[in-house]
Amino acid sequence: MDKPFNHLIICLTFVMPVAALSGCSGPNDSPEQDAVMSISSCTARGDDGQEMSVSEFGMFVTDTAGNLYPDNIRVLNRSGKWTFAEISLSDGDKGIYAYYPYSPSFSGGKMGLDARSQTDYLYSERTMVSGNAPSASITLYHLLSKVTFRMPAAVTAVRVADYSYSASYSLLTGSLEIKPEKGTISSGTGSLLLYPGDSPAMHVALVAG
C-alpha cells in the first residue's frame, strides 16, 4: 500500500473514576478494576496544516486474545464532550482500531469503500491499551491516494470511466480487496481519490464547464 500523504491524530485518554472513601475498599481492590475509557481531544489536520473539526468517528476493539468485539463503536462530539459506549479495561488489554468516517454498516473490523463518493477514508493501525497503561495516541492515515491534475481554467471536472470503484479494507490485517464492479468516478476539484497500488491504464477525461 502506498505510504499515506497526510495524517490525522486522535488522542485518547483513559481515566479511572475515584472510588468514594466509604470503607468499602478491600485489599484486593485495584485501579484496573474501575478503568474506563474517555476521550479528551480529537483533532484533524488538513494538507495545509490547519486544524479541522471531526464530529464523529468509529472504532473496533479486540480483547487480550485478539478476538474482535462485535460492536462497531460510534464516537460523537456533543457540546465539546466525546461520548460513546463505555469500554472497560478491567478485564484485560484492548486493541483499538479507529476509522473515519463512521458508518453503521461496517462490521467484522472491515470498512466498505466506494470510490464514486470520493470520501477521504481514514484508518488506524492497532493501538494497545490496558488498565496500567490506559492512555493511547492514535494516528489515522489516508487510505486512498490523492491524484491532482493541472487543468486549463475551462475544465471544471475530472472523470475516469470503467474504474473498479468498490473495495473492502480490513482494519485488523491491513489488507485492501478491490472488487470487480466497475463504474465512473469524477471530481470537480481537479483531484481524484484512487485506490493505492498498481492499476491498469486509465482513460482520464477533462470536462469543460
Predicted regions and their residues:
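Short aromatic-acidic-glycine turn motif
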Residues: S164-G174
